[in-house]
Amino acid sequence: MAAALLRELGALWVPNLRIWTTQMLRVLPQSCIHTSTSLDISRRWEKKNKIVYPPQLPGEPRRPAEIYHCRRQIKYSKDKMWYLAKLIRGMSIDQALAQLEFNDKKGAQIIKEVLLEAQDMAVRDHNVEFRSNLHIAESTSGRGQCLKRIRYHGRGRFGIMEKVYCHYFVKLVEGPPPRPEAPRTAVDHAKEYIQQLRSRTIIHTL
């Protein structure tokens, strides 16, 4: 009798738990749910090459080509890759290749290979006439797979080592690179700060 009662209670508890979990996931904001870069960006990055834009009007200027390319699961640190990715951001394709050619880091040669692949893809698939008429609009890295392995120590002890991987993403846009923004001076920062103070909302006042 007691066993049958427990089975009935368990059968009722499982559907209620499922309904409660579904409702809580709907209420929770999306920012509370962590998704890694491999799930969030890597799956959608190269799919942006398949975007079809509406036809342009007769007098409208030509839309520049955009090339999205990436390489996943690189045996390299994402932090070391980020410094190299930031180095070439905003450069023309020839200038970026020249900078990476004389950089002795391992990630520089990997990024150079990815840029050459993206350059060939631009001419072959995206109707880009001049392969040098490209600039790097976006260049970033992301966290890849992280494998934990045993590191053997002396006297029968051990530690945990991590084998980290990273992703590299690049976006090439047809045309010359945009002009760099002028550096902001202390006066500009002071004006912005004063404007923020003047636009404050003070409650319980006129």
UniProtKB/Swiss-Prot annotation:
Matching Pfam families: Ribosomal_L22
Keyword ATP-binding among record annotations: no
Record localization: Mitochondrion
Disulfide-bond pairs as recorded: none
GO MF terms, alphabetically ordered: structural constituent of ribosome
Transit peptide, residues from-to: 1-40
Gene Ontology cellular component list: mitochondrial large ribosomal subunit; mitochondrion
Keyword Membrane attributed: no
Cited InterPro entries: Ribosomal_uL22, Ribosomal_uL22_bac/org-type, Ribosomal_uL22_sf
Keywords: Mitochondrion, Ribonucleoprotein, Ribosomal protein, Transit peptide
Any GO BP annotation: translation
Description of how the protein assembles with itself and partners: Component of the mitochondrial ribosome large subunit (39S) which comprises a 16S rRNA and about 50 distinct proteins.
Family: Belongs to the universal ribosomal protein uL22 family.
Name listed for the protein in its UniProt record: Large ribosomal subunit protein uL22m
Encoding gene (name): Mrpl22
